[in-house]
Amino acid sequence: MQRLDALLPTLRERAQETEDLRRIPDDSMKALQETGFFRLLQPEQWGGYQADPVLFYSAVRKIASACGSTGWVSSIIGVHNWHLALFSQQAQEDVWGNDTDVRISSSYAPMGAGQVVDGGYTVNGAWAWSSGCDHASWAVLGGPVIKDGRPVDFVSFLIPREDYRIDDVWNVVGLRGTGSNTVVVEDVFVPTHRVLSFKAMSNLTAPGLERNTAPVYKMPWGTIHPTTISAPIVGMAYGAYDAHVEHQGKRVRAAFAGEKAKDDPFAKVRIAEASSDIDAAWRQLSGNVADEYALLVAGEEVPFELRLRARRDQVRATGRAISSIDKLFESSGATALANGTPLQRFWRDAHAGRVHAANDPERAYVMYGTGEFGLPITDTMV
């Protein structure tokens, strides 16, 4: 964490460059690699720390407080080492056998499929929104398995860089620096050992668990994946808060006879409200992850009720973070609108992150309410 803290000012200074490039600068990715961040969720057998997931998300929060796009990509790329740990040992050797620093991008939206063939699958598709794909040597792509013309499973296909192309299409209003371009796969054979069923992850029968037995790898996918999306947004809220307080401390309000913003009692109220909500968002998000992890460390299972609570609070944390950024942005004055200012960038980045499917509040709230009534839940993202 000390090495990461030392890097934050540099990431903050590069935030505009990151946005202009529409991808994370190579120097930033190299520096993050050197801090050991990407090894946090990597198995010990491959030189990783297989760490407490709260430590990982705390690091993500810090990175995102300096640069939203860098935090977003770091979170997503970083969690893929956790996902790869659940694949077969052979798949892990394929990726990490020669280089344990290899990075993996993803797109889990079913924008392609795999046709069953002898020894594996023939995969075709165009997967949008693969954040950080320019910095990855492999991709994990979600989609159905098709057999006899019918979908029989939903899986992740693990595919090396030489077997797909990247279409540079990412030109957007928020999270511009994430390089979330489209991964295109055409008639690529993927062997069986490089395919992992989401069902196997959910019921803890993933083949990687035979060797990677640390508690972190038994965390529910329905907690890990959504938290990976929300943690950087909460980090952006912390960054927006710091930027707002600094801005208000210097701001003179032209419309109020030169009154200093820091002397405005209403400005102080908004700061207090936003600060409280941001802290509440983080406490809920990290607290549920900590509770689940503590149970697994103790050798116990994570009850379904806790998994539902984690999803409920994860979308609530995202909502709280974004509402707080809105409150701060609305009271920052016209100077905060200028291109290059951090507050407007955090505002755009957080709202862009909000549209991710994992942040759909109604879906998570309906699941929680359904569970409270003791009714069956069919949603798999829990």
UniProtKB/Swiss-Prot annotation:
Quote the InterPro entries the UniProt record gives.
Answer: Acyl-CoA_dehydrogenase, Acyl-CoA_DH_C, Acyl-CoA_Oxase/DH_mid-dom_sf, AcylCo_DH-like_C, AcylCoA_DH/ox_N, AcylCoA_DH/ox_N_sf, AcylCoA_DH/oxidase_NM_dom_sf, HsaA
**GO BP terms in the entry:** fatty acid beta-oxidation using acyl-CoA dehydrogenase; steroid biosynthetic process
Keyword terms of this UniProt record: Aromatic hydrocarbons catabolism, Flavoprotein, FMN, Lipid degradation, Lipid metabolism, Monooxygenase, Oxidoreductase, Steroid metabolism
Any idea of its EC number? Answer: 1.14.14.12
Mind telling me which GO cellular component terms the entry cites? cytoplasm
Which pathway does the database say it acts in? Lipid metabolism; steroid biosynthesis
Q: How does it assemble?
A: Homotetramer. HsaAB monooxygenase consists of an oxygenase component HsaA and a reductase component HsaB.
PANTHER family, sorted: FLAVIN-DEPENDENT MONOOXYGENASE, OXYGENASE SUBUNIT HSAA, MEDIUM-CHAIN SPECIFIC ACYL-COA DEHYDROGENASE, MITOCHONDRIAL-RELATED
Per the record, the similarity remark reads: Belongs to the HpaH/HsaA monooxygenase family.
- Mind telling me what this protein is named? Flavin-dependent monooxygenase, oxygenase subunit HsaA
Source organism of the structure: Rhodococcus jostii (strain RHA1)
Gene encoding it? hsaA
